[in-house]
Amino acid sequence: MGVEGCTKCIKYLLFVFNFVFWLAGGVILGVALWLRHDPQTTNLLYLELGDKPAPNTFYVGIYILIAVGAVMMFVGFLGCYGAIQESQCLLGTFFTCLVILFACEVAAGIWGFVNKDQIAKDVKQFYDQALQQAVVDDDANNAKAVVKTFHETLDCCGSSTLAALTTSVLKNNLCPSGSNIISNLLKKDCHQKIDELFSGKLYLIGIAAIVVAVIMIFEMILSMVLCCGIRNSSVY
């Protein structure tokens, strides 16, 4: 015997929430893949300075997002199917998956908040090392290539923390090509541009995480209410 009355409304409401959750999983997966293949981040994070690769903390977070998006799509489908079939077993499994996902999201959020400045800091240190090598050693072609990639990708020139090297940077043609000396001097320093690059992307991820967390809380409540309704309807 199927559910009736308010429980039936909850059933379809849960289906709608799960469909939205499934779509959110698809959006997160799509955004993660976009961030993974975004030309700006790809150009910078695939660089190597001698035997030292660029910091990969950002990409670790992106791979986690890809996994989360895929799992969300699976869990959303499970919830939709469980609600339509009025299956207590599927809804119980769905609830358990949601609790695990929610706990993982909270843990990831805490880790992200604690380390939110570390990604940009690591990339800035990598840039500074390359800049110093490129200016000090005329034969450091690898370092010069790294610095030029930073400058052309971010449209910046030099660093305020290494202001003494600015003249050498201009003299060695390490600033974006096609710009004159005055325009290069007026460009933002690369530390500021690196901060802007990663803070914008982390802000986008943070908004998505909050929206998904709210949806998950509603889904956990609705799935338990529907489970109780199905159990009670089978008694009568």
Swiss-Prot record:
Disulfide bonds join 156-190, 157-175. Not glycosylated. Likely constitutively palmitoylated at low levels. Protein palmitoylation is up-regulated upon coligation of BCR and CD9-C2R-CD81 complexes in lipid rafts. The record marks 116, 144, 148 as: Important for interaction with integrin. GO terms for cellular component: basolateral plasma membrane; immunological synapse; membrane; plasma membrane; tetraspanin-enriched microdomain. CDD domains: CD81_like_LEL. Its main location: membrane. GO terms for molecular function: cholesterol binding; integrin binding. SUPFAM superfamilies: Tetraspanin. Belongs to the tetraspanin (TM4SF) family. Structural component of specialized membrane microdomains known as tetraspanin-enriched microdomains (TERMs), which act as platforms for receptor clustering and signaling. Essential for trafficking and compartmentalization of CD19 receptor on the surface of activated B cells. Upon initial encounter with microbial pathogens, enables the assembly of CD19-CR2/CD21 and B cell receptor (BCR) complexes at signaling TERMs, lowering the threshold dose of antigen required to trigger B cell clonal expansion and antibody production. This is CD81 antigen. It comes from Chlorocebus aethiops.
